[in-house]
């Protein structure tokens, strides 16, 4: 079952005070209750989806015994995300985050104008998408798909969630994933949630399996979709095997 995060895709727009990673963890719990009320579930989260799984683990650790039978965290993190370096890569890290926060807050007050400029500068935006989303050369259709998806996300939504990315600090919560088969995957050329984040998650989640996809970028689920599917199939087999021993 797939769903759009709040304020994304076909889901309704969230109020700004509820645009947080913690709220996304609560949303995940609600989706499970409404859509899969009984039986084991396997959680798979990419990027902000992975952060949602981490927040869910912090809020509802008991469900990793009662309901959650396995988890996959793909190109994500539980904290330490340098959003200042991400938005302002040429600025020293110590001043990058304050500048980035100020820049995003200022632009958020003119979100409509920003969205207009994004549409007007589609060629530049497409180049930026290719740079940040992918590592190796990929078909143009992949870049166009991601660029279209990003351009359909209003800047006001980006600005609303931005503070939550910098404040994320939940590595202490991921140990509960050690109780179920867990998979951590990331491309070695990820420029958003770099491979170091996945290595740290793997180190904190006992018995987890780490898969590093050489040369792949942040959108590894597109760039290396066949490998991703193979690893997820293997995780499902591990989950079914463990469920069979209960």
Regions found by a protein language model. Give the residues of each.
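Active-site loop/turn elements of alpha/beta-hydrolase fold enzymes
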Residues: 3-7, 76, 215
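Active-site loop/oxyanion-hole signature of alpha/beta-hydrolase fold enzymes
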Residues: 9-66, 78, 84, 230
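Short beta-strand immediately N-terminal to the catalytic nucleophile in serine-hydrolase-like folds
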Residues: 43-45, 74, 185
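Flexible "cap/lid" loop of the alpha/beta hydrolase fold
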Residues: 62, 66-113
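Conserved alpha/beta-hydrolase catalytic His-Asp/Glu region
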Residues: 106-176
């Amino acid at each position: 079952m797939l769903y759009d995060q709040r304020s994304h895709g076909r889901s309704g727009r969230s109020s700004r005070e509820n645009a947080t990673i913690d709220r996304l963890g609560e949303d995940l719990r609600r989706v499970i209750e409404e859509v899969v009320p009984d039986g084991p579930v396997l959680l798979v989260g990419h990027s902000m989806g992975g952060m949602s799984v981490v927040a869910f683990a912090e809020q509802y650790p008991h469900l990793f015994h009662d309901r959650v039978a396995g988890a996959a965290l793909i190109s994500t993190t539980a904290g330490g995300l340098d959003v200042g370096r991400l938005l302002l890569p040429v600025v020293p890290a110590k001043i990058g985050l304050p500048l980035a926060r100020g820049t995003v807050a200022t632009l958020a007050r003119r979100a409509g104008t920003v969205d207009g400029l994004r549409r007007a500068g589609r060629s530049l935006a497409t180049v930026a998408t290719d740079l940040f989303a992918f590592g190796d050369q990929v078909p143009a259709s992949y870049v166009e798909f991601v660029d279209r998806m990003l351009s359909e996300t209003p800047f006001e939504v980006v600005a609303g969630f931005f503070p939550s990315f910098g404040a994320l600090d939940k590595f202490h919560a991921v140990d509960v994933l050690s109780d179920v088969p867990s998979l951590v995957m990331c491309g070695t050329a990820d420029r958003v949630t770099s491979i170091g984040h996945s290595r740290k998650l793997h180190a904190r989640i006992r018995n987890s399996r780490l898969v590093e996809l050489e040369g792949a970028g942040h959108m590894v689920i597109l760039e290396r979709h066949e490998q991703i599917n193979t690893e997820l199939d293997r995780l499902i087999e591990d989950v079914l095997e463990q469920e069979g021993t209960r």
